[in-house]
Amino acid sequence: MRNIQWFKFLVLSSMLFVVASCSKSTTKAISGEPKLEDALLWEITGPGFTKPSFLYGTIHLIGGNDYFLPKGTLGAIDNSEAMFFEIDMKEMTDMGAMVGLMDKLFMKDDLTLKDLLKEEEYKLVTDFFADKGLPLFFLERIKPLFLSAMTYGDFSPESFSTGEMKSYEIEFNKLAENKKMKTGGLETVEFQIGVFDQIPYEAQAKMLVETIQSAGAGKDEMEVMTKMYKEQKISQMATSALGEDEGGLQDYESILLSNRNKAWIPQILVQSKKQPTFYAVGAGHLGGKMGVINLLREAGLTLKPLSKL
């Protein structure tokens, strides 16, 4: 059971790490980017819709004291008949499915971190996880990006049960279950884990070392992201600082964000015509030229901000 908890935790926290690393905070506008209102909650209407659907930008992990719901969110859920996430949360509670996917955490071809790092880098990583009480012997075959996620703060599965940390996906799923709403996912857990296989393990290992070297700044970056989130700065959260950190996750922005956003659009179009649906996806996916809001508008839908400050 504890292994399954860690698996679910790793999936959630790794997606937070991806968004945090790929969408560095910056107030500098990028030429050609659509200007969007600061709002996490949006109404979606369009041809063939009998009722509006809704789009909500989440942050996958947030401190319990910082958790909030913008005005209108509960009303939007009440006016929806289905709730869709990036991943169907039923997958995250299906023990059989989780057990079958746990080997997807590991690198292919029996590769280990030791194969990817210089001796001094390997020692840095070993010492870091040893200080956390996690011998690297048990972790060195795990894909480095998952290990990078584990460096982000002092998160653990237990922090959810104590309320120290919250996940919007988990909280929204509870609401959906209480209302007996249909739930679904725009992707599968297997797909999200497989995304990391498209990033060379050498690049992942390099990012792990750099993340550990700057681990002291991790808490500050989380605080910056949380502040942006509470101010509903979706354009800022989606703005990629491409070129500022050469060799980082910015080089894989299309794999991690843009391509996934494009794949969601036809699914949202089809599902929203069937029934009014509340879509909860990472806020980093909403803004920008290749963000979900702009792509839905290009597909002929009307999106209206509902939660402006």
Task: Give the ranges of each region predicted by the language model.
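Bacterial N-terminal signal peptides that target proteins for export
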Residues: M1-V11
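Generic short amphipathic/hydrophobic targeting helices enriched at N-termini
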Residues: S14-M15, T58
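Residue-level detector of alpha-helix boundary/anchor positions
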Residues: M15-L16, P34, F49, K273
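C-terminal motif of bacterial Sec signal peptides marking the signal peptidase cleavage site
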Residues: V18-S21
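Bacterial signal peptide processing site
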Residues: S23-S25
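Structured, acidic catalytic/metal-binding patches in enzyme active sites
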Residues: K28-E33, L41-G248, Y252
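Short, motif-level signal for alpha-helix interfacial/capping segments enriched in acidic residues
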Residues: E33-A39, N259-R260
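A cross-kingdom marker for long, charged
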Residues: Q250-L309
